[in-house]
Amino acid sequence: MVDINQIPTRRPFHRRRKTCPFSGANAPKIDYKDIKLLQRYISERGKIVPSRITAVSQKKQRELAKAIKRARFLGLLPYVVK
């Protein structure tokens, strides 16, 4: 019979925490006129991508959502993409 203690075990895999792309010294400012930046945080269907996927902090996610909504209202970004 095989002893359980003799079976080699795997090393545990630790995922590194993603850091917020908007915090730091040379981080870009969130602005409703910066369409190229805002489009990175919108899905193909036109929805705002959640922060658990983009690793944006809670405070910056609120700013980002407000900027996206403002750009949509002004016609700079589409509400829905077909």
From Swiss-Prot:
Could you tell me what this protein is called?
Answer: Small ribosomal subunit protein bS18
Q: What does this protein do?
A: Binds as a heterodimer with protein bS6 to the central domain of the 16S rRNA, where it helps stabilize the platform of the 30S subunit.
Origin: domain of life: Bacteria
Q: Give me the ranges of the annotated region Disordered.
A: 1-20
Species the sequence originates in: Brucella anthropi (strain ATCC 49188 / DSM 6882 / CCUG 24695 / JCM 21032 / LMG 3331 / NBRC 15819 / NCTC 12168 / Alc 37) (Ochrobactrum anthropi)
Q: Which HAMAP family has this protein been placed in?
A: Ribosomal_bS18
Member of which family? Belongs to the bacterial ribosomal protein bS18 family.
Matches recorded under PANTHER family: 30S RIBOSOMAL PROTEIN S18, SMALL RIBOSOMAL SUBUNIT PROTEIN BS18M
SUPFAM superfamilies, A to Z: Ribosomal protein S18 (SSF46911)
A Pfam family annotated for this UniProt entry: Ribosomal_S18
- Enumerate the UniProt keywords alphabetically: Ribonucleoprotein, Ribosomal protein, RNA-binding, rRNA-binding
Q: How does it assemble?
A: Part of the 30S ribosomal subunit. Forms a tight heterodimer with protein bS6.
